[in-house]
Amino acid sequence: MTLNGWMQIALYGAVVLALVRPLGGYMTRVFNGERTLLSPALAPIERGLYRISGIDARQEQTWLAYAGAMILFNVAGFVLLYALLRLQALLPFNPADQAAVAPDLAFNTATSFVTNTNWQSYGGETTLSYLSQMLGLTHQNFVSAASGMAVAVALIRGFARASTKTLGSFWVDMTRATLYVLLPLSTVLALFYVSQGMPQTLSPYVEATTLEGAKQTIAVGPVASQVAIKMLGTNGGGFFNANAAHPFENPTALSNFLQMLSIFVIGAALTNVFGRMVGDERQGWAILAAMGLLFLAGVTVTYWAEANAHGVLSNLGLTGGNMEGKEVRFGIAASALFAVITTAASCGAVNAMHDSFTALGGLIPLLNMQLGEVIIGGVGAGLYGMLVFVVVAIFVAGLMVGRTPEYLGKKIEAREVKMAMLGILCLPLMMLGFTAIATVVPAGLAGPANAGPHGFSEILYAYTSAAANNGSAFGGLTANTLFYNTTLAIGMLVGRFFVKIPVLAIAGSLAAKKRLPASAGTFPTHGGLFVGLLVGVVLIIGGLTFFPALALGPVVEHFAGAAGQTFATGG
């Protein structure tokens, strides 16, 4: 570990914190329907979209209607994307003559992008046309992110409102998230990435001749526009197979820093939106503090594990840290930081190969996802995921002191706790259930490229990533098979919608309740004690659930490596 590496981490944290309040204030005005700096230009477009769609922006929805609209929209998006992938060979903007995507891969890919997972069992430059990348994937990058933001805002309204049955309008919230937040920021970022050397063209792939006289095909395309929203919307799916490790997808150290920043900025700022809308910004800062503590711990362990030679590397006499699978233009510090950011934020983009990390270095990204993607998390999804843990933490605190649990003046009762636990428990069911199946059936065992505990980790990582809607992978797993495409897609669907629907049910229940005045016995939820309790609940409920599985994978691999034991390649 070096001073330069710690300075990069400190600078990143400082810039994120500096942007929380201004962006949080802006988004609060957007979702409250107030005038913003962009209103003169965008308000007429917003009203025009409502007229075309037949939407009454003043008509609000109950939680059930809100959930129904959300599901209907996502089903329509899935059908259209699946059709586009299956028909891409017949459609324009296909200069590389890409064939139609196979049915199981199209099912997996459509599910992946609709759920904001962006798991990729394919290489983008060898599988998809420009039209599929733009109209299919980039479009879903916008609307899947906006859908998550809308659900988060609905949950915030559940805490902020009292004695009402409505949570706002899904159509209005999603439109405003896209039009006022995602599109403007993505446009600025895309232009910046082009200035750094990122391609943005509809021209065919470039045919080049190498110095040895060999012919080479250089893949290009509308890269910058997709990368901008893939990071900002915590989608993560790469235009190229190597994702952000590819020089065309992440050309410079500055583009790398901006990509890391854009992954966290909206999720962090939404905690401030929460504080503002419930009338106490300290509540948002407390939640952000809990997220920050978990994030800092993860960065520290990952950076230490990758920067220090140990285990097999130490036995080989290597002292420069683990550079395998990392880009020299980024180095160990930026690669470790990126890995923790992308798995904490449900993004899934990578600038280094996680499969090549040390056992402990790979454990932290895995654990980040298993905690439920609540360390900043996906845009919207991170906040509502952490608020689910807040409900459980407040319930536990109430049990300890023998009082009816309250949060922000709302009683936390059986219905809220049941819905919270449903949202929490569906993730380990998918992650561990499918991992168990894959380790005993031939189709599952054919996937990992490594034997021993690392092969198990490759399977566990895949299902963890899918259910957590992250999308990153241990690249040694051959996932483009009928078995993995199908089971991973099921994990993505359950991990997305079996969390969002209980969250909206909690929001509807809370919005209907009366607000109780604070009393001497009210547990303060803006101080260090609450932050510690929340972190403890996340680690106990989210972390201990997976300890046996982690012990069979990265933990065993770490101790085996320390003893100099390696495992042969092969499933």
UniProtKB/Swiss-Prot annotation:
Task: Report one GO cellular component.
Answer: plasma membrane
Q: Does the keyword Nucleus apply?
A: no
A molecular function (GO) held by this record is: P-type potassium transmembrane transporter activity
Identify its membrane topology class.
Multi-pass membrane protein
Does the record's keyword annotation contain Transmembrane helix? yes
- InterPro entries given in the database record: KdpA (IPR004623)
UniProt keyword annotations, A-Z: Cell inner membrane, Cell membrane, Ion transport, Membrane, Potassium, Potassium transport, Transmembrane, Transmembrane helix, Transport
Cellular compartment(s):
Cell inner membrane
Indicate the transmembrane segments per the record.
Answer: 5-25, 64-84, 136-156, 179-199, 220-240, 254-274, 285-305, 330-350, 375-395, 421-441, 488-508, 527-547
NCBIfam families hit by this protein: kdpA
Query: What's the family?
Result: Belongs to the KdpA family.
Relate the protein's function as given in its record.
Answer: Part of the high-affinity ATP-driven potassium transport (or Kdp) system, which catalyzes the hydrolysis of ATP coupled with the electrogenic transport of potassium into the cytoplasm. This subunit binds the periplasmic potassium ions and delivers the ions to the membrane domain of KdpB through an intramembrane tunnel.
Subunit comment:
The system is composed of three essential subunits: KdpA, KdpB and KdpC.
The protein's name in its UniProt record: Potassium-transporting ATPase potassium-binding subunit
Question: Which species does the entry assign this protein to?
Answer: Methylorubrum extorquens (strain CM4 / NCIMB 13688)
